[in-house]
Regions:
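N-terminal cysteine/histidine-rich coordination modules
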Residues: 2-6, 29
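Short active-site neighborhood of thiol/selenol oxidoreductases, capturing the structured segment around
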Residues: 9-24, 50
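Extracytoplasmic
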Residues: 10-12, 44, 87, 145
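Solvent-exposed loop/turn segments at secondary-structure junctions
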Residues: 20-24, 32, 54-59, 96-99
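Typically the conserved alpha-helix immediately C-terminal to a functionally engaged Cys/Sec
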Residues: 25-41
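Thiol-based oxidoreductase modules, predominantly thioredoxin-like and allied folds used
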Residues: 43-72
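Short, conserved sequence motifs used for protein processing/export or organelle targeting and
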Residues: 63-87, 91-231
C-alpha cells in the first residue's frame, strides 16, 4: 500500500525496446513499438517508448548503424527479469519485460505501470548547442539515492539492410536512442544542466530528450519527454 506521506504523481511507463537490425525477429517488435508510440501521442498519455539498439548481433554480418555497447550493457542489468538476454526484449519501467512483438502482453504491462503513481517529478527542457544537446532538469523525488538517465531520441529513421538476417529489407524505426548518459543523484531535490554530444548524421527534425529517474536496485520512478529547441 502506498505511503500516504510519499508525494505521488501521475503514473508513467518508460518502454525500453532492446532491438537490432541484425535480428530477424526484431522488425515486428519495432513496428509494435511504433504503434504504441503513435497511440500514446494521440491520447497524450505518459508512455515513453524508446528503441535501444544492441551491438551483440553485429557478428552475423550486419553492423546496426544505431547500435551502442552501452545499450547492450544496460540490457544486461535486466537479466534477472527473464533469466536471459534476448532480442527483441521490451522492458517497462525497469520492472517487467516481455517479447517486444507481443503487443497484447506489452499493453498489459504498460497499463499496470500507468496505474501506479510515480514518486518522482521531473521537469525538463532542452536545446541544440554547438556541442550537441544541452538539457536542464529539475527533480523532486521522495527517494534521494537514485540515478538520472538522459536519452536523446531521433523521431524516425529508416535503414536499408544489406547483409545478415534482414538482408534486402528496408527497416523503419521510431524513437531511436542516439545518445545516452547517466549520473547519480545525491539528493531527491534540485536542478542541473547536462550536455550530450550527438553522432554524425543525427536527424534533428522531431528529435526529443527523454529523462528518467531510477532506483539503484531497479525501477523507474519518474520520467519526462521534451522536444529540443533551436540553439
Amino acid at each position: 500500500m502506498p505511503n500516504p506521506l510519499t508525494p505521488q504523481y501521475p503514473g508513467i511507463a518508460v518502454v525500453e525496446l532492446f532491438t537490432s537490425e541484425g535480428c530477424s525477429s526484431c522488425p515486428s517488435a519495432d513496428a509494435t513499438l511504433a504503434r504504441v508510440a503513435e497511440r500514446a501521442e494521440r491520447a497524450g498519455r505518459n508512455i515513453f517508448p524508446v528503441e535501444l539498439h544492441v551491438d551483440y548481433w553485429d557478428y552475423l554480418g550486419w553492423r546496426d548503424p544505431f547500435d551502442d555497447a552501452r545499450y547492450s550493457e544496460r540490457q544486461a542489468t535486466y537479466r534477472a527479469l527473464s533469466g536471459s538476454t534476448y532480442t527483441p526484449q521490451a522492458v517497462v519501467n525497469g520492472v517487467s519485460d516481455c517479447v517486444g512483438s507481443n503487443e497484447a502482453r506489452l499493453s498489459s504491462l504498460i497499463e499496470a505501470e500507468l496505474a501506479k503513481p510515480a514518486t518522482t517529478q521531473l521537469q525538463l527542457s532542452a536545446r541544440f548547442s554547438a556541442a550537441g544537446v544541452q538539457a536542464h532538469y529539475q527533480i523532486d523525488a521522495s527517494e534521494p539515492a537514485q540515478t538520472l538517465a538522459l536519452i536523446v531520441v531521433e523521431a524516425r529513421r529508416e535503414s536499408a539492410v544489406l547483409r545478415g538476417e534482414n538482408a534486402g529489407e528496408r527497416l523503419a524505426h521510431r524513437n531511436v536512442a542516439r545518445a545516452f548518459a547517466t549520473r547519480p543523484l545525491a539528493s531527491g531535490h534540485g536542478a542541473g544542466d547536462w550536455e550530450l554530444a550527438l553522432p554524425a548524421g543525427f536527424v534533428r527534425d522531431g528529435a526529443r530528450v527523454l529523462a528518467f529517474a531510477e532506483r539503484a536496485h531497479g525501477g523507474i520512478t519518474g520520467a519526462a519527454l521534451v522536444g529540443i529547441a533551436p540553439g
